[in-house]
Design a protein with these regions (language model features):
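Cyclophilin-like peptidyl-prolyl cis-trans isomerases
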Residues: 1-150
């Protein structure tokens, strides 16, 4: 294990996106496995891999297939807030294939990625453990996501 990182989620600014991420992470939101079509309410992110890692740019995960095209069996609309930007390393943002195609895939930045503003929903930022993010390699597993309120 590379270690842990801690992130703050911006529930007050992008509530639908955070509710989706938290619901999948905790297993309270139903999702459909992209291969088996089985419906589940288990913690979605536990055990998934970071299938896309570009050094000096981002790490991306959230596909149960580990290939980059799987998701939870639904999409939801983009949710943008003017104060949330890709303006630092450690930004958590939804990966998508265009407007309105958010599902479960997310990425965490290594650098400022301002060209992604208005295209990908920012929903959190890393508070501790950016070194863990920066050292993550393609295929590394996300053991679990723990949600807590502080």
């Amino acid at each position: 294990t590379l270690g842990k990182f801690t992130a703050e989620l911006f529930e007050d600014k992008v509530p639908k996106t955070v509710a989706n991420f938290v619901g999948l992470a905790e297993g309270s939101k139903e999702w459909t496995h992209p291969k088996t079509k089985a419906k589940s309410k288990t913690p979605y992110y536990d055990g998934i891999i970071f299938h896309r890692v570009i050094d000096g740019f981002v790490i991306q995960g959230g596909d149960p297939l580990g290939l980059g095209y799987g998701g939870p069996g639904y999409n939801f609309e983009d949710e943008f807030h003017p104060s949330l930007r890709h303006d630092r390393a450690g930004i958590l943002s939804m990966a998508n294939a265009g407007p309105g195609t958010n599902g479960s895939q997310f990425f965490i930045t290594h650098i400022v990625t301002d060209w992604l503003d208005g295209k990908h929903t920012v929903f959190g930022k890393v508070l501790k453990g950016q070194d863990v993010v920066n050292n993550t390699k393609q295929g590394d597993q996300l053991k679990s996501v723990t949600i807590s309120e502080e």
